[in-house]
């Protein structure tokens, strides 16, 4: 879009009567938690994007504006703040529409312009081809993310929608994007605690790269779950009944499904047949308080047989991405093995929404759980950049950091240590008493 086409739109005094009506699917969600003033600002952002992308089409032939609208819908599920919503609607205008950042800043504020600029820099990266120029872009991206974690949120939602519609790209591009998503954006979502988005990104990428394997696993899971549904339902009801009988009134007991890509990786990692991987069924217990978490643990251990060395306390010491829960494995009906995760509802929200769970419209405290941890990780990227001798070394270090898994060590004294995968453990026997 040439900026001379819509000079009036680049003015703060653009009349409200000229604003393009928001799609009803957006407006209905916005009015559930935002006020009139914020919605009007978002409507102006939509108007800007609508005219900026006028005449542009997506690969499937649809109007381009449908993409930022669908990205915004994903972000609205997280109930993000108005600036994030505005940035999502306009996230492609710098790259695709000849719009200048300083004009966005004048109209929508510096935060919105900086988020869009950060998302644009992320979009220019090719993580499969780390060369000097691309590594320089990665440095700029790390700085943008460290300044405002909302850059990551908008970009993850952008990538998720692109993966949902990836079938319209050439096959070579599909493979490239899927590989990049598995290696970069999935781990990035994990780093900031966005578990639901991470799971969908992984499954969509896996389906694109290995459609036959995906089909086989989906079919096997469907046939397997049908035969055991009665047992699972019976265990769920028993768990609920025991908790209620012991005054845990508001407990919710749900089945816990693993995403297909994680099942596939578990089969490869453990070298076990599919039937053994699915022998263990997962349940999640949601309660109101931390005290209820530990009480619930004692109750279910009293009625079912705990499996030795299968208890983990991530409430006492959370994972680095903010995840908190009690994990235990039990032998239920007829020695049927089950895995149980116990969380407060707040912990569950954090586990699924990550930094967005505490960003929300009304919560602006960046010193809370997952946001603080994400900010610390992003700040560590800046330290990494300073220690790297050149941009390429920095880019390689980031890829290794995203790819690294953590191993949690539980000591006999109940201490929990987070170690990098591959770390060596040295055991020193206690000195004899003198």
What are these regions (language model features)?
Residues 1-282, 286-338, 343-416:
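Active-site helical microenvironments for divalent-metal-assisted chemistry
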Residues 427-434:
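Conserved small/polar residues in nucleotide/adenosyl-binding loops
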Residues 41, 423-425:
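Short, structural beta-strand-to-alpha-helix junction motif
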Residues 290, 425-426:
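Alpha-helix N-cap/helix-start and coil->helix boundary motif
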Residues 417-423:
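Short, contiguous acidic and Ser/Thr-rich linear segments
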